[in-house]
Regions:
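N- or domain-start disorder-to-order transition segments that initiate the globular core
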Residues: 1-50
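FAD-binding core of FAD-dependent oxidoreductases
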Residues: 54-68, 72-76, 83-106, 136-158, ...
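Glycine-/small-residue-rich beta-strand-loop submotif within the FAD-binding core of flavoenzymes
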Residues: 10, 14-17, 21, 66-96, ...
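Alpha-helical support elements that line or immediately flank enzyme active sites
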Residues: 109, 151-162, 203-216, 220, ...
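Glycine-rich anion/phosphate-binding loop at the beta-strand->alpha-helix junction
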Residues: 143-152, 297, 301-401, 407-408
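Accessory "access/gating" subregions that flank catalytic or transport cores
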Residues: 226-348
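Mobile "lid/hinge" segments at catalytic clefts and subdomain interfaces of large enzymes
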Residues: 149-256, 403-406, 420-450
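Short beta-alpha connecting loops at secondary-structure transitions
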Residues: 203, 239-243, 282, 323-324, ...
Length: 451
């Protein structure tokens, strides 16, 4: 199956299909025309204009006052990619690398970047042949785009760097030769278009959100099972309560749990307690608030992945090349901090339900979910593990977007730290999956003990 990159917006549903069903990528004819027309326009402007064009006929960052001769324009771009390729730390997940390639190809195809068609086609070839550049998680300030990681992503275009190929890290030059791919001679502005952009942040954001959509669903299912095991009351999930405070996520969560427990033999039993602890009773309010937050974050990220975030930006229809600030990652930095908090709360309330299930405070299930507590420790220590992970998430949820360290001789005097916000949000999401898995195991054991 093939996804044709076109001016049509990317959606999470489309991206999920591309990743999960191993779609190939191709450029639509509309996108090819936009790329070619923009490149021709840029070449004409360089030839006909004596006016300096940032990053095209000048140096970069605080070196923007230095003019570059026309003979050196291609070398300028190659030098940029090589000098900026300094991402550090652990290699990022290969699905996130695939997302980076997809999102960059989509952004460049919108016809405002001035790149060669052959460059975009090579990015697509890398995606389709699963030749994935090695990109590491540290090094982006999240302003001027994601310079260091994107430089590592595109080193293989010029026969440099390393790639994942058939499960191994290989020299990019060797894999290019094996596949018959000649190195790309970067044109004017092209290195800048590749490196200036928010695709490191946005690919992590998309990856985290695809997990978040599932986590929000699983939290309701696992929470409903825990409510059953704990002999909890259904009353707090009745529609009248939700109508009195009609937040969409709250209404959805309560409806989900009512549906899951409809006809349950446990719910038909007489209850001796008047109410349940908050971790059960307030699932609609807590899960629902996280759901609403996730949907807000998704709206921002979907807008971002369909935007042009390199600089300068070319507007052929207005005969303008504008040096602006669309590369600044503040929109993503803020919502990634928000998403990490929303997800962490799903983990926090889950761990509290796990604690209640092993506490023996209801009398319907034994302490630590084991027939002979004392002789056996039962499910004591999985709760320790969940608590440790919850604590770790609290550390990770310290906002990154409140920080800024100036760079490039103060030319770039405010940065978003969105790269750090995005990478830690993926870690929070993965941690919440672990916490929910522990709750599921405890809830299933508690149910079995009552059969």
């Amino acid at each position: 199956m093939v996804h044709y990159i076109s001016p049509a917006p990317l959606t999470f549903e489309v991206i999920d299909k591309i990743l999960s069903k191993n779609y190939k990528l191709a450029l639509s004819e509309d996108s090819k025309k936009l790329i070619n027309d923009c490149k021709a326009y840029l070449d004409h402007k360089i030839e006909s204009s004596a006016k300096p064009l940032y990053g095209i006929t000048t140096g970069f960052g605080s070196l923007c006052k230095i003019s570059i001769s026309k003979e050196d324009l291609s070398q300028l771009q190659a030098n940029l990619v090589m000098s900026h390729a300094c991402s550090l730390g652990e290699p990022i997940h290969q699905d996130i690398i695939r997302l980076m390639l997809l999102l960059k190809a989509h952004a460049l195809s919108l016809g405002k970047s001035g790149v060669q068609l052959v460059t975009v086609e090579r990015i697509i070839d890398m995606f389709n042949h699963n030749v994935l550049p090695v990109v590491r998680e540290l090094g982006s300030l999240g302003a001027s785009g994601d310079l260091a990681p994107l430089a590592n992503l595109f080193l293989p275009l010029i026969n440099e760097g390393e790639v994942w190929y058939k499960g191994k890290i290989c020299d990019a030059k060797a894999i290019n030769a094996k596949l018959g791919w000649a190195p790309i001679e970067l044109g004017a502005k092209e290195g800048l278009a590749l490196l200036n952009g928010t695709q490191f942040m946005s690919s992590h954001a998309v990856y985290a959100l695809l997990k978040a959509f599932k986590i929000a669903k699983y939290a309701d299912i696992i929470g409903a099972l825990s409510l059953e095991a704990y002999d909890g009351r259904i009353d707090p999930f009745l529609p009248q309560i939700q109508a009195a405070r009609p937040h969409p996520g709250q209404i959805e969560t309560a409806r989900n749990i009512r549906t899951l427990l409809e006809g349950s033999e446990f719910q038909q039993k007489e209850k001796t307690h008047v109410q349940d602890p908050y971790s059960f009773r307030c699932m609609p309010q807590v899960h629902g608030a996280s759901k609403d937050s996730i949907m807000y974050v998704a709206s921002v990220v979907e807008r971002e992945i369909n935007s042009v975030t390199d600089n300068p930006t070319i507007f052929m229809e207005d005969d303008l090349i504008i040096s602006g600030g669309n590369f600044h990652g503040q929109p993503l930095a803020l919502v990634m901090d928000f998403l990490s908090i929303a997800l962490a709360e799903l983990g926090s309330i889950s761990e509290r339900r796990t604690y209640r299930l092993i506490s023996g405070d209801r009398g319907n299930i034994p302490e630590f979910l084991v027939a002979n507590p004392g002789l056996n420790s039962g499910f004591m220590i999985p709760q320790y593990a969940a608590a440790a992970i919850v604590s770790k998430n609290k550390q990770l949820c310290t906002p990154c977007s409140v920080d800024s360290i100036p760079s490039s001789n103060e030319q770039e005097d405010h940065v978003s730290m969105g790269g750090n916000a995005a990478t830690k949000t993926v870690k929070v999401a993965e941690n919440v999956e672990r916490i929910l898995a522990i709750e599921l195991m405890n809830a299933a054991q508690a149910i079995d003990l009552q059969r």
